[in-house]
Amino acid sequence: VCALIVCAFFSFTLLVVPPYEIVAGAGADLVFGLSDIWPIFAVAGVVVAVVLALAVSLLRGRAFDIVLLFLFAFGVAAYVQVLLLNSELPTADGKSVNWGDYTSIMLVSTVVWIVIVAIPLVVGHLKTSLARGGAVALSLALIIVQGVGVGSLFASGAFEAVTKEPDQVNVADLRMTEDGLFTVSEKSNVIVFVLDFTDTKQMSQIMQEHPEEFNDWTGFTWYNNVAGSMVPTRYGVPFLLTGQLPQQGELFSQYLATRYERSTYLDDIHNAGYSMGIYTDTFGTEFSSEDVQRHVAGLTMNYHPMNQEDSPSLLDQEGTLFTLWKCAMYRDLPWAFKPYFWFYTDEVNNGMTLQVESDDGEVQQSTLYTMNDGAYYDKLKTTKLSATDDGETGAFRFIHLLGGHYPFNLDENGNDIGTDNSDAIRQIRGSLKMLSEYIRQLKDMGLYDNTAILVTSDHGDWGIYEDWDSSSNAIMFYKPAQSAEVDAQPIKTVSTPVAHVNVQPTIIQAVGGDSSKYGETLAQVPFDNRVRKFYTTTSDGKNDVSIVEYDITGWATDFNNWHKTGAIWDAQQ
């Protein structure tokens, strides 16, 4: 009994609680939620606890007590690590970590672990029965404490499920799938590619050093004087899908909650008769009301409910187990071991998602969309685009790729060569290869001339700053649906002062809607000294601190032309 209780505490603390808390805390960043993954870890936790208890019970005398107390102490140390020693933990954003900056906390953590592990062993040597009884009692107490916390995670989800109307979609079941990712229309197509974290300055370098990357981009215009909208991705992508910016006098939380509600952009595309596929891990609808989330999901062909009956066919159970256990070790082990378990969000999503092989050249329905450019490129080359008529007028696709975002694992040919074995320029060139392949397939299908393609980024290069000292410039390329003669011309460069605010009118014009309600299209922007707005985000390294508005006049790549307006939003309000 003693062994079972202590082993249950060890297993629960290190192998069950961390995955539950990590998934619940990640919210919309992960493709699967707590309701999908909980049985895997409940079963695994019980199995580990029972097997470990049986193994410990085979020991006799001093060996039994030493192993029992060590497991107890290890669990307590992990509990203390999470509770008190993880405040400086680097975020899981894929950026390489200089672990040398954490030497002090590594030393402190190591000392704390040594002390916590040593105390029960020393007491056990002197007072065996006291140490054993104390370990059992504290194990039970900490199981109860952590159990209450885990219960609260499930209670919030259960409350949401029972308060919705019987015929309504449970928003917790909504998943971004690949449905329609490799289909286009024979009638008309409007395609938006978003290359994450890709900057105009980087694109200028590629244009100069590797102009051959754009040989297939005939009929395109490259805009090299671009102001984006907002940074980082969690603000930039939703802007591209709504056209909404924070307003003077409103709380930033109110902006987040209403940006989809007050936008008609996606509705206008849908009402123009275009089937709509949106492929991103940063939709940003989770701040909206449930009714708005259901409405937006209903506009798309690929963002739809996946309940627990569907999840087993989509969830890689073994991959989920080991991926989230790796995350658990990163969180719970002492600092000296964290570099060996470092992870990033897209790695977790890819590890949890079952990669469904194409069947007879067609991607199976309801494969979950994850940010994996290498896998996307492979599927594009093997599956290839196909023409369907699922939209009355045509097809609209919004495809978010990693582009120049770290970690850098793609070479210039789009091949996955392993994490941090590449660099930003090589990886961006790899992304351009993917877009060139997409373009070539459209040309081979005879659909290039009736396809409008806009290529941008959610934001340009940036870092976590207390104050900004350099520009961040999204990229912008555009080709409208046009004559074969114009589509055969080489890519050209234009320096008009454009920004993300010109994306929505350009796309609405492309689907045949009234672009004037959104402003000027890219082609309508004149050569003038207009003021463009940009919204930067300051951070303390853990949380967003403030949203700061800038005016940009002249060349957007020159930070001397960026000036604060004095408008600031508290990102936590």
Q: Which residues make up each language-model segment?
A:
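Active-site-proximal alpha/beta segments of enzymes that process anionic O-linked groups
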Residues: 58-117, 187, 197-415, 511, ...
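Hydrophobic alpha-helical transmembrane segments in integral membrane proteins
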Residues: 147-181
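Transmembrane and membrane-interface helices of multi-pass
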Residues: 1-159
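A long, amphipathic alpha-helix that forms part
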Residues: 135, 168-191, 201-204, 370-392, ...
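Small-molecule pocket liners
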Residues: 237-238, 472-476
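Metal-dependent active-site segment of extracytoplasmic phospho-/sulfohydrolases and closely related
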Residues: 191-192, 207, 212-215, 430-471, ...
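Short beta-strand segments
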Residues: 278-280, 396-403, 425-428, 452-457, ...
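Membrane-interface soluble catalytic domains
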Residues: 1-40, 64-76, 262-272, 276, ...
